[in-house]
Each structure stands twice: as C-alpha cells, then as structure tokens.
C-alpha cells in the first residue's frame, strides 16, 4: 500500500516556503506556521525536511527531537556535468537531486558536499558534479 510522505521545505529555502522550523507551540494565528506544530497536530512520528542549504538543519533537529518527532533531512543539490565550466550556458544543463542522510556520518558527509558545492562549484548557485 502507498504511504504519504510528510515532506516539507522551510523558510531557509528563501522565497519557497512560509513554514518555519520554530519549536512546538511557536506558531501564531496570524503568522507563519511551524513545521513542528503541523507534525505534532497531525500526530506524525517523523517528517522529511528538504532544503537547498544546511542552514536550518540544527534548528530543525533540536526542535523535532524536543517534540519527540524523528527528522529525516535531505539536501537538494544542483548537479552539472563539470563544475569547472563557468560559462554563459554551462548552467543550462543542470538537474536537481536530493540526498538524504540517515545518521551522523551521513550528516557530516552532507556538510562536506554542501561546503564543496558552495565554494568550488558555485556558479549562480551551489553545484556539484560526479567527479
């Protein structure tokens, strides 16, 4: 049978979501909703957070843990043929991929990949290749 995956993007993916990673009970009636509050209200034991950077991971991890909810984090990356190509049309052939970490070692590897993409591969946005 099919399972619905509780998948969210947070406000750290600038302009793509009004959901925050605030702690349980931080949502306001006239303000943005907390992903943690949504998951708590729906009695979810886990949720998937996919963002374009690692910026909100620790906030999400601590607030989800405090609420007794398991966080499954994914980093959305741009993949190109060659990060050394930084020419006018080189970003036309990029595609997106989501990498999930399942433990601390995976989290540390995502940090390395994200850092590399932001420093070595940056051309309009962080990117990686298969080299």
Language model segments and positions:
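Phosphodiester-processing cores and adjacent nucleic acid-binding clamps
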Residues: 1-131
């Amino acid at each position: 049978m099919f399972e619905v995956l509780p998948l969210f993007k947070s406000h750290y993916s600038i302009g793509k979501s009004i959901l925050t990673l605030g702690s349980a009970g931080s949502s306001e009636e006239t303000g943005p909703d907390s992903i943690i509050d949504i998951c708590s209200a729906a009695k979810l034991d886990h949720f998937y957070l996919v963002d374009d950077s690692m910026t909100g991971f620790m906030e999400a991890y601590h607030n989800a843990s405090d609420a007794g909810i398991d966080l499954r984090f994914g980093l959305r990356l741009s993949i190109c043929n060659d990060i050394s190509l930084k020419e006018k049309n080189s970003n036309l052939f990029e595609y997106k991929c989501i990498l999930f970490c399942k433990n601390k070692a995976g989290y540390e590897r995502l940090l390395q990949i994200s850092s590399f993409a932001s420093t070595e591969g940056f051309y309009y946005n962080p990117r990686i290749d298969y080299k």
